[in-house]
Structure formats: C-alpha cells, structure tokens
Amino acid sequence: MAGAGSEARFAGLSLVQLNELLEDEGQLTEMVQKMEETQNVQLNKEMTLASNRSLAEGNLLYQPQLDTLKARLTQKYQELQVLFEAYQIKKTKLDRQSSSASLETLLALLQAEGAKIEEDTENMAEKFLDGELPLDSFIDVYQSKRKLAHMRRVKIEKLQEMVLKGQRLPQALAPLPPRLPELAPTAPLPYPAPEASGPPAVAPRRIPPPPPPVPAGRLATPFTAAMSSGQAVPYPGLQCPPLPPRVGLPTQQGFSSQFVSPYPPPLPQRPPPRLPPHQPGFILQ
C-alpha cells in the first residue's frame, strides 16, 4: 500500500521536481521514515533493545552468586593441589615400603594390629559391663573401634588371598619333569624256518644254585644233605625209551639199552571178514 502510494505520488511529479527531490536530502529522509517498512523495522529494533536490557539486568542479579562460585572454585582448586601433593607423598612412601617389605611381612603386621584392636574392644566391653565406662562414651568409641576392627579383618582376608595366589604361582609355572627316553624297538628273535627238517635241539639244563648253609644246632634236611654231598641231581636217573622213528629220518642213537615194556604183548587179532562187492540198487545193512 505504501509502495503503491509513493509510486502514484512520484508519477504526478515533473522531471524538474524529481531532480529537486533528489537534491533535497531532508525531504527524502522524511519520506523514508514515513514508510511502513521503516516503521516496522524501527519497532522491532526498539523491542529487541528492551529485551536485551531486561536480560542484562537479570544477569546482573546473578553477579554476587557468580562471584561466590568463582571464589569457591578457587578454594577447591587449592584444596585439590594440597590433596594431590599429599597423594604424591603417600604414594612415594608406599612404593618405598612395598619395595622393602614382602606380602608376608605386611600380613604379619596387619594381623598384629587386628589382634590389638580386637583386644582393645574386648577390654572396653568388659569395662562397660563392670560399670567403669558411661553409656554415651562407650557407644561412640566402641562403634568406631569395631568399625576399624572389621575393616582390618577384611584387609587381612584380602591380603591372605594375595599371599596364597603368590605362593601358587611358582608351582603353576614349575618346569615339567624331563621325559624318559623312549626305548628303541628290539629286533625280533630269529626263529627257524618251518621247512627245516630234523628234531629240535635240546637246550642244556641250568645248574641249580647251592643250598644255604645250615646253622649250628640244626639238622640238615634230606634235600640239603643230598645237594651238599656231591653233584646236585634234582631227580634220579632213569632209562628213557627211545623216540619213535619218523618218516624219512634215521633212528636216534645214544641209549644204552632197549626199552622193555612191563606188560605182555597183545594177542593177534583175526582179520575182518571179506564182503562181496557192492552191487547197485541194494543197500547193505
């Protein structure tokens, strides 16, 4: 609407009037300020300035709280530096003690301290039962000492587990025993071929060991007497019968006498009767 009115206003002016309007800056500024777009921009600017002012005033209200928090942060940072320095000192001391003491030593010291605090709490309980300590002081001191005793007991158990694990570790990493050398397979004994002819060779009999000496005061047994008298013969000599001859082999020699059977010779038997030749078609009964 404003743009259309300005165009209609400029359309009714002559060229000379337009040139004069261009040269008159005050009139141009007044015309621009009267435009609707310029008025809207000015209104938005004023509203934005008012909003920023209110926000700035609200932020200024937080200035004391911000200063307090800054001072607190500075104080906490200084405390952190102090604690960090104390941590470094304790860590250095702990490393020095850990390098000079073993787990077993620490466990023994901790067990001694645990036994001491247990004894102190028991003595305090006995004094309270005897009426030597008031109730208020007994509750405060006894509770703190029992808490300390419980913490030491837990530390002792954890340290015992660490010691046990430290003792089992070398056993788990112990070298394995050396393996026994494997025996080389023995060569098979040579056996005679099955095609070999002739009787098997007789192996000589092993001589039995001599009998133990008979102590004094005891009679010798017949076996001991026979063995000590001469050559050890475990059984009397007998004349053995000759081996029966084999087909295709000569009779073995070397026996002094022929074997005589103690039984009479068998009676001669009659030959079986002769049967007629077999005829086809008949069954013999």
UniProtKB/Swiss-Prot annotation:
It is a peripheral membrane protein. Its main location: membrane. Keywords: Endosome, Membrane, Methylation, Protein transport, Transport. The modification Omega-N-methylarginine is found at residue 218. One of its GO terms (molecular function) is calcium-dependent protein binding. It comes from the Eukaryota. Residues 175-201, 230-285 are annotated as: Disordered. Residues 250-260 have a biased composition (Polar residues). GO terms for biological process: macroautophagy; membrane fission; multivesicular body assembly; positive regulation of viral budding via host ESCRT complex; protein targeting to membrane; protein targeting to vacuole; protein transport to vacuole involved in ubiquitin-dependent protein catabolic process via the multivesicular body sorting pathway; ubiquitin-dependent protein catabolic process via the multivesicular body sorting pathway. Residues 262-279 have a biased composition (Pro residues). Residues 84-173 form the VPS37 C-terminal domain. Belongs to the VPS37 family. Component of the ESCRT-I complex (endosomal sorting complex required for transport I) which consists of TSG101, VPS28, a VPS37 protein (VPS37A to -D) and MVB12A or MVB12B in a 1:1:1:1 stoichiometry. Interacts with TSG101, VPS28, MVB12A and MVB12B. Component of the ESCRT-I complex (endosomal sorting complex required for transport I) which consists of TSG101, VPS28, a VPS37 protein (VPS37A to -D) and UBAP1 in a 1:1:1:1 stoichiometry. Interacts with CEP55. Interacts with IST1. Component of the ESCRT-I complex, a regulator of vesicular trafficking process. Required for the sorting of endocytic ubiquitinated cargos into multivesicular bodies. May be involved in cell growth and differentiation. This is Vacuolar protein sorting-associated protein 37B. It comes from Homo sapiens.
